[in-house]
């Protein structure tokens, strides 16, 4: 015990030294570009040696969605993810999944076997590991490595449906829930027709996928074992896919359900057969509650954070139209408190399904990322696109398991990630430049982010709270000056400046 205490004390002292040194460096007027600073593996391990503290702060930091990356690929790239300033990763679903034709690994293609990315969204048993991402042992090893870097692991789970081909569901799943007759809601094979009808929306078949009876106590017991095993392996949170299709306690009940108690149980407020969700108070939990008719998005925040899907759509349009009007940018377009929102400029659904974001360029995505990450509230989620040509849906370079493209390491992405860390607790203020094509985001009196969508250079002359002096922006090395409270400088076309 004495050795453990001494080791822990030394770790705390090292972290304190690192943090104090970083603060002293940041307070100086440096002429170097911080985003290009080389950080050793040893420094990263010391700086992030308290993952419990890190998990509590996921809500205020940034998440990287490592979409379709295998566990081993994630593990190999954790040093780069940490250097890029991400404090959490979100994996694709890690459960046993549909295998289909020849266990294909194509993300999407027109070949005979077609695309398979959506197969891990069709669970056939609630146990860790699938042919696409890796084994339970590999998942556990990845989580252990992530903990060394202070990176939280969030796992995507999809409880309310199963394979579109029911014979794929493994016998252990069927037996655990009490047989085939108890697997689905009474309404579970009927397609949703009226999306504003909460009974249909929370019990009906969606997208060809039968609706699992998530209120069946036997299912809940079985699924709790999976959740707690995932936590035991090192998961620090969960994203609940299609969360708005799982009923809230006061929603209409299915004929096969006694209570709509899924959310109280799987957020740690209620036990199932004596089993509680492990470490519930430490987990970051959020639900995919896409906004629409009678989505009840605010009501879900009693249990989990929720997605700000309308804001993401509005922001994409604003960037594509080069109109960063303050009314568009400031309005979350959501009834919930903004500290309960998960934000994105692109998600795997907006990229991979109808492709409404797939034609956006790398810079357009970085501009959107800069805006949501520079803001005071919301938890920004960065979608890692597959490798290949930009502004292209499924370029055909990557397959399932591969690393995505390198945009997560772009200096503009890294700079705003670190800006967010430095600005926790500071208020936000928005202004436009000479036109609505330029946006200036101020965080208290500590920092400024400028996004320039113009085809030409923008001359900045703006009153700020920053101390007088010369500043080098952390993204592109642009020189700025503050004199008598006026920030001046020039930002070239299609650039982002991060100043603090």
Role assignments for model-derived ranges:
Residues 34-67, 73-83, 175-194:
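N-terminal carbohydrate-binding accessory modules
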Residues 2-14:
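Bacterial N-terminal signal peptides that target proteins for export
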Residues 68-75, 133, 137, 213-217, ...:
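Soluble non-cytosolic domains of exported or imported proteins
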Residues 71-74, 80-84, 88-89, 138-151, ...:
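An active-site-proximal structural segment forming one wall of the substrate-binding cleft
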Residues 29-31:
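Bacterial signal peptide processing site
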Residues 57-61, 97-144, 176-213:
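Aromatic- and acidic-residue-enriched carbohydrate-binding clefts of CAZyme catalytic domains
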Residues 24-27:
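C-terminal motif of bacterial Sec signal peptides marking the signal peptidase cleavage site
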Residues 38-60, 76-82, 93, 98-121, ...:
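Active-site-proximal helices and loops of the catalytic beta/alpha 8
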